[in-house]
């Protein structure tokens, strides 16, 4: 259960009383500091938030206050560093441009998705000694840096040893999703460059911050269909076979196995919706087939959380 909220300024606050009550009820406590998605209007971060500001210590005073609230609770707590940064509408990842305030669209249109993030001059630069590769998507390298910063801040500096860190809920996409995304771009865009950038941004290997900074690999897996009536811009329905969903999951798990073979996997979000419908015979069929396959055929998956909006 969530035990923290955000005030009008986008600062996190932890409800110790509510967390203790949830603990007594046998619930797992989940918290987040700032969502590492620097989009305008993001409600789970201060106005104008960027990963670069986070790494420069701009928010340290508020994070220290938040750490104090967590310390009052002091029991095992699941810490997420962001939500589904590569999901549908992942229009920022961790930010692009020299200061990390630009969008993925900006990076594609201006052909500036690489080599503009250099963490070597930041405080605690040793955390990022292998980050800043010119051939890797800047937005995903900022996510990696943010994960390391959060871990170092809360675990090492603040001593909150009871926190267990996930990996932001990396979204499972259809195998051909990048091709669809590139095809939807306007003709004025260099689509060869766009595909190169998208492939780099959506690589789990590029994103993974390293075993030292992650306790759980968290994935978001929805066996969702896309109906034109629900999704702006769609001109036809896309009903995706169950086998295609599992082919996409298998592809991501192969990436996970390559870079994090010893880490348990957790579905931070998991659902079987029929488009946006929460109950239909097709959704029920997906639940029956999908859930049994997950439980019987994927021993590396140690748990899941059903997402309330998409059961």
Please provide the spans of the model-predicted regions:
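Hydrophobic faces of well-ordered beta-strands that scaffold small-molecule active sites
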Residues: 1, 27-33, 77-81, 162-164, ...
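Acidic-and-aromatic substrate-binding clefts and catalytic sites of carbohydrate-active enzymes
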Residues: 2-17, 37-40, 52-61, 169-179, ...
């Amino acid at each position: 259960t969530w035990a923290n909220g955000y005030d009008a300024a986008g600062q996190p606050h932890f409800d110790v009383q509510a967390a203790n009550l949830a603990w007594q009820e046998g619930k797992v406590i989940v918290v987040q500091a700032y969502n590492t998605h620097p989009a305008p209007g993001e409600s789970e971060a201060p106005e104008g938030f960027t990963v670069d500001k986070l790494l420069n210590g701009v928010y340290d005073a508020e994070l220290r206050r938040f750490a104090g609230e967590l310390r009052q609770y002091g029991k095992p707590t699941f810490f997420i560093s962001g939500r589904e940064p590569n999901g549908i509408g992942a229009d920022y990842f961790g930010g692009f441009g020299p200061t990390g305030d630009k969008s993925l669209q900006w990076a594609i249109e201006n052909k500036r998705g690489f080599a503009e993030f250099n963490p070597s001059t930041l405080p605690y630069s040793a955390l990022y000694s292998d980050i800043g590769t010119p051939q890797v998507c800047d937005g995903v390298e900022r996510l990696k840096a943010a994960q390391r910063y959060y871990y170092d801040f809360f675990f090492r500096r603040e001593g909150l040893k009871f926190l267990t860190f996930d990996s932001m809920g990396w979204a499972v996409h259809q195998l051909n999703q990048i091709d669809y995304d590139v095809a939807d771009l306007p003709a004025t865009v260099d689509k060869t460059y766009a595909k190169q950038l998208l492939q780099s941004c959506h690589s789990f290997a590029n994103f993974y911050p390293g075993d030292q900074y992650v306790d759980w690999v968290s994935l978001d897996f929805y066996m969702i269909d896309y109906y034109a009536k629900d999704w702006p811009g769609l001109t036809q329905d896309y009903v995706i076979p169950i086998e295609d969903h599992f082919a996409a999951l298998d592809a991501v798990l192969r990436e996970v196995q390559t870079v994090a073979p010893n880490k348990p996997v957790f579905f931070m979000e998991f659902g079987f919706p029929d488009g946006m419908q929460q109950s239909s015979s097709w959704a029920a069929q997906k639940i029956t087939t999908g859930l049994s396959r997950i439980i019987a055929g994927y021993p590396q998956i140690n748990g899941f959380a059903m997402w309330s909006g998409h059961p």
